[in-house]
Each structure stands twice: as structure tokens, then as C-alpha cells.
């Protein structure tokens, strides 16, 4: 290699030969250091985000999974329910039952029988009864009428025909039913035939709808009593042993719901109907007060009839006494709000029941709910935004009732 003289520029090859080689530690250590730094930055980012998401007021909080522990909260699992409408062979509405599972874990529930003769609204002609609503709009109009009466939506509605009842009731049949009188039918030629004799009758699957549909007086209360007797006897038979063994092997929500309800304590409700005499005819009307109270008991966590119409509520027990959960929930529902979250306050020992709101526009709703519960109100801009209102049950809950 020749030495450059002043003014000469070294060639590229000369410059490369002049640059000293990097030490082995730098050649391998720097890339490794860079990879480690990037990985560690990712770990710190994930850890930081987790800390922020799990923190409140500058303190790290662990998720509470024990339903009995302070701080536990959960979105409600809305009550599983179904409207079951039955048509006879001519397509006429003969029975409506609202089935609600009170406890998804332990089984049991309530069945409300609604007579087709009950007065309704929205018909094109008069008189307007549930049976007329069915004639005009089928099961959709029946569902609309009954849910409006209850002020609660149902999970689903199903239409039952004679063949479908034969299939559903078959595995647990015949069902013994006690009848106080002979049920006499008139044949097409005018002769009378005893269709179901007085006393204990074993109702075959193919005769279920004939019994449920057998005509009665104008108000339909006699037929409602027979329907109640059949439902009670059938549910007893379904509930023996494994309920699913006493129902058809079909993947239907109705089958699963009936198995769940029959597997626990069952309540049959057929009382909130009153026969009112008018100048022309006897009319069957609903006792709105009884229906409203029954709806609170049937639907522990109801589906809102019109979502967003009522304030949503987060209900927290601040007493540490779980026996107050159910009465507090019922009191809140009677106040006309939608229950969305239930749980426990972050600590026990709360003295005063109060309704917390974060939006001044909800002050009126908070005051109304507080008055219904006998508690106070508190405005807190930092209250949970999950619901419109937060109810914290305190030790004064019973004295406020």
C-alpha cells in the first residue's frame, strides 16, 4: 500500500483497511442488549396497563370473585322465562302460561296461568279480550299483551298445538287429575257425551289439550282451575327423579326450562283475575296490584320491557348481611327501575341507605328511589358509570321500610 501524499484522497478500499475491527463483545453484545431492552419494555408496558386497569384511587385492587366478600359485583343474569300459548285443533287460543325459573342453580320457579277471556287492549273490534288479540295477530299479539300486563319481557314465546303437547307430556303420562264434576261434551248430532268423568281421571298425552280447552262459563275461571290442576299434577310427575328423563329427548329450550322448574319448588299462580259483572256480560279483568307484586316475585332479575326507558340500578349490600339481598332487590324493583348490577359494597358497616347519582339530570329519579327505600341521596361525579344510579343498603334498611 502506498502512503497518500497531501491533497490525495484515500480510496474506499484503503479506508476500509484503515478502520480498526470492532471488538467481539460489541459485535455480539449490542444486538443482544437491544433485544433484551425491547422485550423488557414490552413487559413493563403490559404490567403498567394492568396496574392502571386494576387500580382505583391510586391503590391496586384484586378482582373479587367470592359473592359473599366485600367489593364483589356482577351483572345480573336475567330471569329465564317463556310464554307458552296453547291452541286447540281449530287454532283457537285456549291457554296461556308464563313460566319463569326463579333459581337457575337450584331449580324451581313460578307458572302464571293467564285466561284467554281476560280483558285486553288494542283489538280492532269489541269486546277486546286476549283471545281476540290472538285471532288478530297470533302469538305475537298474545306476547305483547301479556308482557305489557306484567311490565316485564319474557325470554321467548312458544306455540303449543295438540300434537306438540302429546310429545311434551308423553314421557310423564298419564297424569292423574281430580275433577269435581263431569265434563260433558255435545256431539255433532246433538247428543251429550261425558268426555271426562268426575273424580280422578288419568289424562293421556293425546287428551291434554282437550282437557285444557274444555269450555266453561263466560268468565273462564272454572277452566282455569282445571288447567291449574293439570299443571300441578304434571309438574309433580316431571319432577320425580331426573326431570329430563320425564320429558322428551329433544334439544328444545322449553324442555330444558320445564326440567329446571320441575326440579325445584314450583308455585302455580292463577289468582290475579277477577270477574266483574256488567249490564251485558261478565268480564274477567286483571288485578293490577296483584299482577305487579307477582311479577316482582316471579322475575328476580327481569328483562326490561322497553330497554333504556327506566333508570338502571347497581345494588350493593353494605351491611354484610346476605339475608337482606332478596328484600332489597324486591324493594328496588317495586320502585320501577331496571336492575343491572348486584353485589356488595367495598366494606361492611354502612349505616345509612343511600342512592348515589353522578348526573344532575338523574337527581329526580334518585330522590324518588330514595323515598321508596327510605334512604338519602348523594351526588358523586366519580360514581360508577356502569349504571344510572347506585343503591347502597345500610343498617337502617329495615327501619326505613
List where the protein language model places each region:
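Non-catalytic, solvent-exposed segments at the cell envelope interface
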Residues: 2-401
Amino acid at each position: 500500500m502506498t502512503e497518500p501524499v497531501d491533497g490525495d484522497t484515500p480510496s474506499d478500499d484503503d479506508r476500509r483497511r484503515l478502520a480498526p475491527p470492532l471488538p467481539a463483545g460489541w459485535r455480539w453484545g449490542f444486538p443482544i442488549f437491544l433485544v433484551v431492552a425491547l422485550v423488557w419494555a414490552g413487559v413493563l408496558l403490559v404490567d403498567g396497563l394492568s396496574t392502571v386497569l386494576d387500580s382505583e384511587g391510586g391503590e391496586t385492587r384484586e378482582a373479587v370473585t367470592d359473592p359473599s366478600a366485600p367489593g364483589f359485583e356482577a351483572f345480573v343474569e336475567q330471569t329465564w322465562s317463556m310464554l307458552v300459548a296453547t291452541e286447540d285443533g281449530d287454532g283457537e287460543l285456549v291457554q296461556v302460561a308464563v313460566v319463569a325459573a326463579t333459581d337457575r342453580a337450584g331449580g324451581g320457579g313460578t307458572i302464571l296461568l293467564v285466561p284467554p277471556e281476560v280483558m285486553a287492549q288494542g283489538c280492532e273490534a269489541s269486546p277486546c279480550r286476549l283471545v281476540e288479540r290472538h285471532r288478530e295477530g297470533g302469538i305475537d299479539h298474545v306476547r305483547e299483551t301479556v308482557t305489557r300486563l306484567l311490565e316485564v319481557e319474557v325470554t321467548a314465546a312458544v306455540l303449543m298445538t295438540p300434537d306438540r303437547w302429546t310429545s311434551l307430556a308423553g314421557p310423564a303420562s298419564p297424569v292423574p287429575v281430580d275433577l269435581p264434576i263431569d265434563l260433558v261434551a255435545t256431539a255433532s248430532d246433538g247428543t251429550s257425551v261425558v268426555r271426562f268423568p268426575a273424580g280422578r281421571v288419568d289424562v293421556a298425552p293425546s287428551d291434554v289439550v282437550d282437557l285444557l280447552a274444555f269450555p266453561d262459563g263466560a268468565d273462564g275461571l272454572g277452566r282455569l282451575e282445571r288447567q291449574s290442576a293439570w299443571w300441578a299434577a304434571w309438574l309433580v310427575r316431571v319432577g320425580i327423579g331426573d326431570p329430563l328423563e320425564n320429558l322428551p329427548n329433544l334439544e328444545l329450550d322449553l324442555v330444558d326450562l320445564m326440567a329446571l322448574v320441575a326440579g325445584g319448588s314450583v308455585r302455580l299462580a292463577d289468582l290475579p283475575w277477577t270477574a266483574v259483572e256488567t249490564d251485558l256480560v261478565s268480564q274477567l279483568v286483571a288485578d293490577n296490584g296483584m299482577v305487579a307484586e307477582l311479577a316482582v316475585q316471579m322475575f328476580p332479575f327481569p328483562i326490561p320491557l322497553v330497554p333504556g326507558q327506566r333508570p338502571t340500578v347497581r345494588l350493593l349490600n353494605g351491611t354484610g348481611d346476605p339475608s337482606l339481598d332478596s328484600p332489597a332487590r324486591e324493594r328496588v324493583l317495586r320502585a320501577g327501575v331496571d336492575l343491572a348490577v348486584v353485589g356488595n359494597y367495598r366494606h361492611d358497616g354502612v349505616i345509612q341507605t343511600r342512592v348515589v347519582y353522578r348526573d344532575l339530570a338523574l337527581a329526580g329519579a334518585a330522590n324518588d328511589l330514595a323515598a321508596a327505600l327510605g334512604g338519602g341521596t348523594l351526588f358523586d361525579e366519580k360514581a360508577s358509570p356502569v349504571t344510572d344510579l347506585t343503591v347502597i343498603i345500610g343498617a337502617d334498611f329495615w327501619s326505613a321500610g
